[in-house]
Amino acid sequence: MLQTKNLIWTLFFLGTAVSLQVDIVPSQGEISVGESKFFLCQVAGDAKDKDISWFSPNGEKLTPNQQRISVVWNDDSSSTLTIYNANIDDAGIYKCVVTAEDGTESEATVNVKIFQKLMFKNAPTPQEFREGEDAVIVCDVVSSLPPTIIWKHKGRDVILKKDVRFIVLTNNYLQIRGIKKTDEGTYRCEGRILARGEINFKDIQVIVNVPPTVQARQSIVNATANLGQSVTLVCNAEGFPEPTVSWTKDGEQIENEEDEKYLFSDDSSELTIRKVDKNDEAEYVCIAENKAGEQDASIHLKVFAKPKITYVENQTAMELEEQVTLTCEASGDPIPSITWRTSTRNISSEEKASWTRPEKQETLDGHMVVRSHARVSSLTLKSIQYTDAGEYVCTASNTIGQDSQSMYLEVQYAPKLQGPVAVYTWEGNQVNITCEVFAYPSATISWFRDGQLLPSSNYSNIKIYNTPSASYLEVTPDSENDFGNYNCTAVNRIGQESLEFVLVQADTPSSPSIDQVEPYSSTAQVQFDEPEATGGVPILKYKAEWRAMGEEVWHSKWYDAKEASMEGIVTIVGLKPETTYAVRLAALNGKGLGEISAASEFKTQPVREPSAPKLEGQMGEDGNSIKVKLIKQDDGGSPIRHYLVKYRALSSEWKPEIRLPSGSDHVMLKSLDWNAEYEVYVVAENQQGKSKAAHFVFRTSAQPTAIPANGSPTSGLSTGAIVGILVVTFVLLLVAVDVTCYFLNKCGLLMCIAVNLCGKAGPGAKGKDMEEGKAAFSKDESKEPIVEVRTEEERTPNHDGGKHTEPNETTPLTEPEKGPVEAKPETETKPAPAEVQTVPNDATQIKVNESKA
């Protein structure tokens, strides 16, 4: 009975199971970590009111509408299990259980396998390393199964490079020992799982940073302060990435200030310091920095400074005071040396009696002592004299420059009087007695005569004029009583001083003495000695008197005393040849004409050839030209007709003889050879013949090798000046061409003007004779220089009937210089011959004044 009951129940359940068939689609599932997947539970059968439930691997019933593992009841016959973002813990057997209304259950299971795909967990890119370090390239790979890691660079397995620096570590990281900049690039970390045939890779960019290197272009930079100049400090920095450069001054960061004291270049590698002064002297450090590190370089800026006097002080002392000290302080770098000078002496450069360097220097007379220490110098004056007063200049000097400052020493002293004690004059002649006064403070000056203060009613012919440095007593003697002693007294708060002056009555001078008479044909030079007594006043003039033997009338002439006294000679002119004369002299001063000397007889020479002229040379500024002055001497009683000049370089042939008019007083020799010795011979010629040759020797300068450059920054010609020069040159060239056409072809603008305006004959007319006074001396077909001499009408009066010019004391032998007329030589292939200029003398002839004694 019991067995039958159990059989019935078994059949009942089997019938129910058949009626509820449960299936899960898909029947199995593999999910990669992080992926999502769903499973559908389907129920087949006629049962109603079924309940479909899902259970997790740990047996817990999954509730609907969960976020990550979701269960959704679709209808009476299906339900969906969805696993979002699966992880390893979600793996296991999930069960779908269907419960009928009668309580019967049916179920199905699905085995969910969750595996880890080959993924790169930690493989950042780029990865940066410092050059030279051991670099480890990180590549963390995660996978359910252990992967095989391969590293590639430039498409090749790094292991195959056979570079011992490349090592794959046990954690599959790639190590590069002592990584280099050339190792930079893309490295591929490739993972493989053989069981699944799975492969994945990650490209990692490897960057090798190079630590910066920095080098100062100059480790020491010199500059000068207070000149408004700028100085640039330069650092050359390299590295990767490009390093940033910053600057410090004595450890403090330098910023780009608003006043633009500091200026930086775009990459800050250059630091410009504007308006350098002494405060800018410091140690500057340029710091280059990037990811790989930093490096610095030092630059020492040395700022030199021109000396500057920072302290001087004026001093006051009393005469005969023991000593006084003047002090001078100066700044500058290098430390300046200080020297002292006055307006009359350079104290520091004088020979020293003792010299303890650098502290003490003493002058030979021991009056001044200079002490110097560092930037301070003092000048001590001993036994003060009034002459020590005045300006003292201290000068500070170093290699950069110098500075000077003046200070003043005041010396207070009693008056000191000076002046000519004896003063000469004569009755009616006004004279000043000068009393020079030296005093500090200023002195009051008084004049006395016989104890009586001047001026007074008793001395109406006396006036007094005072200046800061002297007092003048103006006396106009009326009688002998006005001559005698006068007293000058000066008083200040230090003391007083008096000086006696004597007013002496002047006399006329004594007679000059004639030493010798040098007669010529028409002139005579009288040598004399000045009078032994001048009478107390200067001699103003000399009077010469002469007459021919047998004549009663004396001829006379006045000569300026200064000119006559220079050589002690007066020249009398207008004499007749072969005639005996007597001559005598007298001197004139302010008092009057003195005694006349005894007469001295002489006889003039017969008419003869002239005396040789005196020659004096003056080199031209160009160095290869010379002006030879012709100083006319005695003409021998017959007018000089002309001068003959010849010259040559020593050891060379003579240049063609040059004929100069008698009025010429110099000749210009140009285009001479450089650094050559020349000799010049000049002969004067009159109707009687030629004089002896005057000889003159000179040497030209060495040829300059270069024209000195002008150092002035503003010496260059402006564009306008250059254009002006070119225009003037062009105009001169046109004029030269026109002049050439005029003289050679009788055509051109000048010829047109001459024909139409001046009435000159046309090109076909016969040329007129040359004007008087113009001559050209040349030889046909000669290559010798052509000398053209132009002068005004020569005055050549008949020697027998007219008077002629002789040198005298008022007309010097050298006659007035006139504008030169050049005589240019022809051009040859050899060096240009000398160019000769002559200057005529058109001075008015001196007319001899005759006066009777």
Curated annotation (Swiss-Prot):
One of its GO terms (cellular component) is axon. Residues 508-607, 609-704 form the Fibronectin type-III domain. GO terms for molecular function: cell-cell adhesion mediator activity. Pfam families: fn3, I-set, Ig_3. Disulfide bonds join 41-96, 139-189, 235-286, 328-394, 435-488. Residues 838-853 have a biased composition (Polar residues). The modification Phosphoserine is found at residues 778, 782. Residues 764-853 are annotated as: Disordered. Its main location: membrane. This protein is a cell adhesion molecule involved in neuron-neuron adhesion, neurite fasciculation, outgrowth of neurites, etc. This is Neural cell adhesion molecule 1. It comes from Bos taurus (Bovine).
